[in-house]
Amino acid sequence: MNRVILLLSVMCVGVSSQPITENQRLFSIAVGRVQYLHLVAKKLFSEFENSQLEDQHPLNKIFLQDFCHSDYFLSPIDKHETQRSSVLKLLSISYRLIECWEFSSRFLVAGFAERAQVTSKLSELKTGLMKLIEANQDGAGGFSESSVIQLTPYGNYYQSVGVDESFRLNYELFACFKKDMHKVETYLTVAKCRLSPEANCTL
């Protein structure tokens, strides 16, 4: 019996000490960074909402009728399609979303140090995502960095509310930043889970 226990212990140690691949390491870093960005996005959005005046509260409901520019990207429409998407597709969409915000984050109304840190984290995440894309192409064709998409104003849906233009644009930036970081966190979490065949990647 002691020999059996010893053998099982050795086997368990062998399994748990399997070396982490470079792919897994990069995925862990990427997921950690986007989780941080998602938390910051939620914090900034919450602070901005709490700073609203009473007559600006209707903006919350009206925004639900609007769309972020990123909604026009070819991306999964629900959790089922997300789970069926390839790792490369999820990485590519995540890259495009982060690429957009690398520029637009400079216009977030936040403290200078906090805004600079967000932009820096986005740049680091973008670099990491490109490495992951290159590592997971498997002959699926090249990936071009040439199409940088910059976010622009989202329309005039809020004029009837009577809010000024700067408030409307700031609200849209915060709301879309939070929405897009949630998307990227979901996509990268699912893609990372695919590295573990035994794992349950259900959303």
From Swiss-Prot:
Main localisation: secreted
Has UniProt tagged this entry with the keyword Isomerase?
A: no
Keywords from UniProt, A to Z, are: Disulfide bond, Hormone, Pyrrolidone carboxylic acid, Secreted, Signal
Q: Per its UniProt record, what SUPFAM superfamilies does this chain match? A: 4-helical cytokines
Report if keyword Ion transport is assigned. no
A single Gene Ontology biological process assigned to it is: animal organ development
Q: Where in the cell is it found?
A: Secreted
Tell me where in this chain the PTM Pyrrolidone carboxylic acid is found: 18
N-terminal signal peptide: 1-17
**Disulfide linkage:** 68-176, 193-201
What's one GO-annotated cellular component? extracellular space
Q: Molecular function terms in GO for this entry?
A: growth hormone activity; growth hormone receptor binding
Please indicate which superkingdom the organism of origin belongs to: Eukaryota
Task: Give the function comment from the record.
Answer: Growth hormone plays an important role in growth control and is involved in the regulation of several anabolic processes. Implicated as an osmoregulatory substance important for seawater adaptation.
Q: By what name is this protein known?
A: Somatotropin
Source organism per entry reads: Verasper variegatus (Spotted flounder)
> What gene, per UniProt, encodes this protein?
gh
